[in-house]
């Protein structure tokens, strides 16, 4: 593997296979190496009976913004969920922290590029900007059906390292991600 070539790495795969878990482990690894992580996760929100009731956008180093809820009064809708239009602020926070002019010890984290995130105003432009820049390394997750719903974004992603995650390969993929992170900063 060339040093950080390409400088973006993505995971995809079916629900529940461990994409976000692998991403969090990769972020922990980067932080231990002294790398500043900038970006977001999209954790699900569960009620007391462990039923999924929504999603947040968890902006690293800032906190959570509600993305979607089953019982909300927002106008945007995706399946059973209502989408919070104000969640677009999360992307503005992330952009504010990135300096595309200088390559320093930063890593952009995107979990995930999916249908709910793409419903937010300005989100597609945000993802295109992140995918087209070549200064700051990126690790991310994209929805497994992105090639069908947003082929333009998928074309940008597939130019990079892409792992189809499975239960069988997830530990090997994590090791490859750690090696890739090392190649980007050492």
Predicted feature residues:
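Walker A (P-loop) ATP-phosphate-binding motif of ABC ATPase nucleotide-binding domains
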Residues: 8
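Hydrophobic anchor at the beta1->P-loop junction of P-loop NTPases
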Residues: 11
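The conserved Walker
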Residues: 15
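Conserved lysine of the Walker
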Residues: 19
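Hydrophobic positions on the alpha1 helix immediately C-terminal to the Walker A/P-loop
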Residues: 22, 26
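N-terminal phosphate/diphosphate-binding loop that engages ATP/GTP or pyrophosphate donors
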Residues: 28-78
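Phosphate-binding/switch loop-helix module in NTP-utilizing enzymes
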Residues: 74-128
